[in-house]
Every structure is written in structure tokens, then in C-alpha cells.
Regions:
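Long, low-hydrophobicity ectodomains and other hydrophilic envelope-associated domains
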Residues: 1-275
């Protein structure tokens, strides 16, 4: 296992290369300990700040198939930032080492951490579509106004491609930051009030499905645009689940744009899909 850490505020960096014993039960805790110890040795603080973190885990199945989990994210906390850093890495290591499907031989783990004291965070204030009428399959530009911490507001433009199967009529879109969960509360409330479309019968999930969940999970530094409701029966039928996990995964139309900072907040817009 190799861990590289940079404290950008102090201009200090360091790394550690450690050989881990082959023990599925202990692998997650060893990964957590090596990461945390390396970070604390270089950063030498327990305060707040922003962390950029990326990692990859390579493994091999019993049948010789190559397995890879690769992930990056950003975190911010006003205190205890170091304890947040290894959570996703430990989750990924736990999946590979202790999954119920098959034995995975993990042979490489790499992690890179960059820490800073500044809060690299901006909140979505508003969102405005550049046009109010779009066609199915057309790309829609959305201007998103953001308020950073103790700085002037600015605007970023993100793109959303209208699903080809989207029926004519009003289409509500939710524009949110990857670190925001306020939209989730509103969605669950709306589902309770309006009823939830019938879902497909859940399919049996495989290890590859769980790996894909980690590799494709939302990042805190993304602006995410998704259809805010599922009035279209064709799209609703594609949802295999209607609970919290499915809401977090979003609809098949969800699209993401990566930013160089953590994005919080949410905004809703409405456009007309024409025939």
C-alpha cells in the first residue's frame, strides 16, 4: 500500500509504503490505520480545512479477472477533517475483502491526499436555463450562480442533455451540489405526497454492481442535474427501487459536471419539452 500526503498550507509532503498482511478480516482496519497515520504525520493537526483525496485498489478474482476501484472526492469540515479522509477507501477495501460473492486477491492500494486550511466551498444560489423550450435529445445550457466562502459570487455554466425518450410537456430539473442532501428531503416528501411509481422487480445484484456503485458515486465537488420527478411512466419503470438508495442514485437522466471546489446547495428550474 502506498499513501502520499501533501499539506499545501505548509508546503510539506510525505509518503509511506507499507506491505499489508493477507487477511481479509483485518484489511479494512489496516488500510484505515496506514492512511490516518500517514496523514497525521505530515499534516500534524486535527483542525478543519479542505481535503482532496483519490485512491485506487487493484485486485484479481479467483477466476483471474482484473478488479479495479478508482475514486476521487473532496471534503470540508471546520474540525476533524483528518478523520473523514479514509472513509470511502475503507468502504471500498471492505467490499473487496469481505464481500459474500467471491475471494478477491487485493495486490495494490494507492492513495493520494492534499490538505489545505482554506474552505474551498461554494453554495448554489440560483440556476437559470439559457432557453425555456427544448426538444428531446437536445443539450440545454444552465447558468448556475454560486456563492463561495467570503468571496464574490460567480457563475458556472453546466450542460444537461434532455433524454431522447422525454415526452413533450413541462420538465422539472433539480440542480444541486454533490455535498447537498436538502434535495433528498424534498424528494422523499414529494414521493410521500404524490405517490411513488411502481418499480421494476429488483434484480439480483453482483459484485460488479457494488463496485460500479463506488466508482460512479456522486462527488462533493460536482454540480448534478437530474429530473426532479418521475411523471413519465417509461422513465419511472427504469427505476428498480424507490427508497433512499434509489433516490441518491437518481434517475437514468442524471448528469454531473466536476468543479474544482466543493458544491453545496440546490435550485430547481422548469423547462418545456416540445415535440
Amino acid at each position: 500500500m502506498y499513501v502520499s500526503v501533501t499539506d499545501s498550507s505548509r508546503g510539506v509532503n510525505g509518503s509511506a509504503r507499507t506491505e499489508l498482511i493477507d487477511d481479509d478480516a483485518l484489511l479494512p482496519s489496516m488500510v484505515d490505520a496506514v492512511t490516518y497515520n500517514t496523514v497525521t504525520r505530515v499534516a500534524d493537526r486535527e483542525g478543519g480545512g479542505t481535503a482532496r483525496f483519490n485512491f485506487r485498489i487493484d485486485g484479481r478474482s479467483a477466476g483471474g479477472e482484473q478488479i479495479k476501484i478508482q475514486r476521487e472526492n473532496m471534503y470540508y469540515a471546520d474540525a476533524g477533517i483528518l478523520k473523514m479522509i479514509s472513509q470511502e477507501l475503507v468502504q471500498a477495501a471492505t467490499l473487496l475483502a469481505q464481500n459474500k460473492f467471491e475471494k478477491i486477491d487485493v495486490y495494490n492500494i494507492e492513495a493520494n491526499v492534499v490538505l489545505g486550511t482554506e474552505p474551498e466551498v461554494a453554495e448554489i444560489i440560483s440556476a437559470r436555463p439559457q432557453k425555456l423550450n427544448v426538444r428531446a435529445g437536445e443539450e440545454l445550457a444552465i447558468d448556475v450562480e454560486l456563492q463561495p466562502y467570503r468571496a464574490e459570487k460567480f457563475t458556472r455554466t453546466v450542460k444537461f442533455t434532455v433524454p431522447k425518450q422525454q415526452r413533450p410537456g413541462k420538465m422539472a430539473l433539480n440542480v444541486r451540489g454533490g455535498s447537498s442532501l436538502a434535495w433528498m428531503q424534498e424528494l422523499m416528501k414529494r414521493q410521500q405526497e404524490e405517490g411513488i411509481p411502481a418499480a421494476k422487480k429488483p434484480q439480483r445484484r453482483t459484485l460488479k454492481d457494488f463496485i460500479a456503485d463506488i466508482n460512479n458515486a456522486d462527488q462533493n465537488n460536482e454540480i448534478i442535474v437530474d429530473i426532479a420527478a418521475l411523471p413519465d411512466p417509461d422513465m419511472a419503470a427504469q427505476q428498480q427501487d424507490t427508497g433512499f438508495a434509489a433516490a441518491l442514485a437518481g434517475t437514468p437522466a442524471k448528469q454531473k459536471t466536476t468543479m474544482n471546489f466543493i458544491v453545496d446547495g440546490t435550485a430547481d428550474i422548469m423547462v418545456e419539452v416540445t415535440g
